């Protein structure tokens, strides 16, 4: 730990440090998943099954968004999402079918400190618990650390949303604490769990994710040999 001229411990020097760039993703492609910049024209038809009236009601409990009634409302919602200048939205596409199965966003971007959050994660039931969903998260994290060269990658969720927190920890995010009464939404109070991954974590996290995603870790029917937590 560095020590200054007064004998005080201080953080590591960041000599030559510069601020970060904003995301500029057209697409990212893996074995199973393809991330594409969200497009109403390209993705709305598929995303009606993700955001529409037939989705499970419990899917929306911890999301700021609610399900939509029809295509007209979905188009309005997607256009509102795309109009935001502080967030970058992406569709998660199954490479095997070309179908969009979910969306997520890079948001709360602090360029000066190279901090960014993955949020607004909206996965269809079809996407949850799949290689496609895990690989999509891997591709986005790899972009954050290896292309944008950001230092800190965040995940936040309602403290009562245990599936979200478990998903984050499975991917390699580390729980840091709970911000009490941080948000009011849907007419109720919310404590918010904060989790993060930093650049020093990424090499080990990357190795685990790549080992789990490798074809040899799966049977022909798609079942895994080893869970991600076993790596």
Kindly label every feature range from the protein language model.
Residues 140:
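Flexible ATP-lid and adjacent glycine-rich G1/G2 motifs of the Bergerat
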Residues 133:
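Glycine-rich acyl-CoA binding loop
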Residues 167-168, 195:
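Conserved active-site tyrosine of GNAT-family acetyltransferases
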Residues 155-164:
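Conserved beta-strand-loop-alpha-helix junction that forms the acyl-donor binding cleft
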Residues 146-156:
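Conserved GNAT acetyl-CoA-binding A-motif
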Residues 174-188:
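Conserved catalytic-core motifs of GNAT/GCN5-like acyltransferases
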Residues 1-130, 143, 147, 188-192, ...:
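GNAT-family acyltransferases
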